[in-house]
A protein has these predicted regions:
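Conserved N-terminal beta1-alpha1 strand-loop-helix module at the mouth
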Residues: 1-78, 82
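Alpha-helical and His/Cys-centered functional microenvironments
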Residues: 71, 95, 103
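Conserved anion-binding
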Residues: 87-100
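Single conserved hydrophobic/aromatic residue that forms the stacking wall/gate
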Residues: 99-108
């Protein structure tokens, strides 16, 4: 049996039906749900924030892998953790002090 985990991104999903899209991924065998968060600053696109993630929580018990493509990332770690992120992925170049940011993620 493989140890590979399948974590499909919802970035290309129909945002008007995100709950249904996530349930479809779960039925298809996804192990996690990958959620790309973009702020229009660190990257040019804007996607979703903690409020949407908290609403999506009711649609699945699968872990959420929340990929924060935002700056400053440290200001929002707790918000995304509280919203339902199980895994938080950051870009080291988005933080000034990685040695402080990583313990912050571990503490939430």
């Amino acid at each position: 049996m493989s140890n590979i985990k399948i974590s499909p991104s919802i970035l290309s999903a129909d945002f008007s039906k995100l709950g249904n899209e996530i349930q479809s991924l779960e039925k298809a065998g996804a192990d996690l749900i990958h959620i790309d968060v973009m702020d229009g600053h660190f990257v040019p696109n804007i996607t979703i924030g903690p409020e949407v993630i908290s609403k999506l929580r009711k649609h699945t018990a699968l872990p959420f892998d929340v990929h924060l493509m935002i700056s400053p990332v440290h200001k929002y770690i707790k918000d995304f953790a509280d919203a339902g992120a199980d895994i938080i992925t950051i870009h080291p170049e988005a933080v000034s002090y990685t040695h402080l940011t990583l313990p912050t993620i571990c503490s939430v």
